Design a protein with these regions (language model features):
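Bacterial Sec-dependent N-terminal signal peptides
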Residues: 1-28, 452-454
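Bacterial Sec-pathway N-terminal export signals of envelope proteins
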Residues: 20-72, 78, 236, 242-281, ...
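Sec/SRP-type N-terminal targeting helices
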Residues: 43-47, 60-61, 106, 120-148, ...
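Acidic, low-complexity, intrinsically disordered peripheral segments
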Residues: 77, 236, 429-454
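Membrane-embedded beta-strand positions in outer-membrane beta-barrel channels/transporters
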Residues: 113-115, 159, 263, 329-331, ...
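A short glycine-centered flexible hinge/capping loop motif at secondary-structure junctions
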Residues: 190-194, 406-410, 447
Length: 454
């Protein structure tokens, strides 16, 4: 029996080890790479990019001549047909006569033609349309990069929140363990009459509070993991664990570039800035395209055709040969009055041009504001982190001293709980400042490099 129980325990432990080995831990890079491959919104942006590529090809093709072939085949039926023979004379009832035929007739004819046409001049509308389509293609490509950057930023924020929650859980576990230990000691003292029942109740309350904090931090951890899985397009039942960076303290205290340095670098790198610039260029072309409505249009057209019918004595091939004809011509269309359509289009295009210029200025200001806030938050968090480290050390030493004094009866439960609360607050402030510094410092680097890895 003992051997069976031992074997069963060994199997259970082996199963747990196998599960632990097969549960993959995701690094930040792996999360980002997976999201860039599977995110649905990003896939939609890539589809839009492919559509813009097709629009460029279609616009280029409009410069070439159009070519078409046409044919028509016609049949004609005549139930009473006079072919000059096979007729007879009948009276018309008035003393006269007429010739009637008893023969029906069916005739057939066909025509064939090839036509070509192309626009020779239309005020540069087609050329500018090609340029605009290329710009729109580039804007669509930048939209893909914008979405990629947004995903990277969102994943990094949640990743850091998970790291924070993991450490918060460990802090709350340690707090619960010390609170439980103090309660056990207090109960022993109460049994021998060293402390009052009210102090035991206080210690019990502290344990319950520590349990609540632990449950709350675990719930936050689960919520952040769920958000990460949703960003990665993972099923809700799939388990995900993240890889803890080796040097979080070093990341928190990494050197910060100045605001101006970061802004100058980001200005040349960020896709949203390039996108607004290209949008302004596209609006300039839109004005030129609208103005082309005032220009004349010159078109060239040419065609060749032939025909046949069954009434001819010539063969089918001879008919096609002798009926062959060709034509060529040019068409000039000069706009005189178009119900203000062109003028309205020009005015609308200019208004859109002004709006896009303002949008470009706004994007630059927004970028500067974002970088300024990231730098300020990172710098402030670094200073808080350095101060919080000293505060935790002091709070830890004070708590240990009061705990020893409580054990020998020199301090009461209220004083012990106060010191433990101070230590917990200091530890939480340390965690918060550390991960706030990590997030903002790394995001600042991300705006300067396009990569966010730690």
């Amino acid at each position: 029996m003992y051997r069976k129980i031992t074997c069963l325990i060994s199997l259970l432990l082996a199963g747990n080890c196998l599960f632990a080995q097969t549960t993959e831990r995701w690094s930040l890079k792996e999360c980002i790479d997976y999201s860039l491959e599977h995110n649905i919104q990003l896939k939609q942006e890539r589809i839009s990019l492919e559509e813009s590529e097709i629009n460029v090809k279609s616009s280029r093709a409009s410069l070439f001549p159009s070519l078409s072939f046409s044919t028509s085949q016609n049949g004609r039926y005549q139930p009473y047909f006079d072919d000059g023979g096979n007729s007879f004379i009948t009276s018309d009832g008035s003393g006269g006569s007429r010739v009637s035929s008893s023969k029906e007739h069916f005739s057939y004819s066909g025509s064939y033609g090839i036509n070509a046409g192309m626009t020779l001049y239309n005020g540069g509308k087609k050329i500018n349309d090609i340029k605009q389509k290329k710009l729109l293609r580039n804007i669509a490509e930048l939209s893909v990069k914008e979405r990629e950057n947004t995903l990277k930023e969102e994943i990094a924020k949640i990743f850091v929140q998970i790291l924070y929650s993991q450490e918060a859980i460990e802090v709350n576990k340690a707090t619960l363990a010390t609170a439980q230990e103090s309660l056990n000691q207090g109960q022993e003292k109460y049994k021998v009459g060293k402390i009052a029942r009210s102090e035991v109740v206080q210690l019990e309350s502290q344990v319950k509070n520590a349990e609540y904090n632990l449950v709350n931090s675990e719930a936050q951890y689960a919520q952040f993991k769920l958000q990460l899985k949703q960003l990665l397009e993972l099923e809700g039942s799939d388990e995900i664990l993240i890889e803890q960076p080796a040097t979080t303290e070093q990341l928190a205290l990494s050197t910060l570039a100045t605001v101006d340095e970061a802004y100058t670098t980001a200005l040349a790198l960020r896709p949203e800035i390039a996108s607004t610039r290209l949008t302004s260029e596209s609006s300039e072309l839109a004005v030129k395209i609208a103005k082309a409505g005032y220009s004349p249009t010159l078109s060239l057209n040419a065609g060749a055709g032939t025909s046949n019918n069954d009434n001819s004595n010539n063969s089918f091939g001879e008919q096609l040969k002798y009926n062959l004809n060709a034509s060529v011509g040019v068409t000039l269309s000069i706009p005189l009055y178009d119900n203000r359509t062109t003028k309205s289009n020009i005015q609308k295009a200019k208004l859109q041009q002004s709006s896009n210029a303002l949008q470009e200025i706004s994007a630059r200001k927004e970028l500067y504001s974002t970088i300024e806030n990231l730098w300020f938050d990172a710098h402030s968090a670094q200073k808080k982190f350095i101060a919080a480290k000293s505060n935790v050390e002091s709070a830890q030493a004070s708590y240990e001293l009061v705990s020893e004094q409580f054990n020998v009866g020199l301090k009461n439960a209220t004083e012990l709980l106060t010191e433990r609360t101070n230590l917990l607050v200091a530890q939480q402030e340390l965690l918060q400042s550390k991960y706030t510094a990590i997030l903002n410092a790394q995001l600042l680097k991300f705006y300067m490099s396009g990569d966010i890895l730690f």
